[in-house]
Amino acid sequence: RGESMLGAGIHPGDLVVVHCQREAVNGEIVVALFDDEATVKTLSRKNGRTWLLPANPDYQPIDGTQAQILGKVVAVVRRY
């Protein structure tokens, strides 16, 4: 849901395929649990902080310090 990852080619209604893993590296697109809600964002770790970055300038970065990484996005499926 949502348009926060349009710049990464993930559109509303797309299905994401996720490799379940608790760790991810800087720059990977992840599914993270934040405030009891799953979100798809780009992981950024900088100066000891963790950020969940949208790929749409209309959305703000999320302080991901308390977020739990659920997995890494490995594919996107779009229905036509």
Label the predicted regions:
Residues 1-80:
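Acidic/glycine-rich C-terminal interaction modules and beta/coil loop segments
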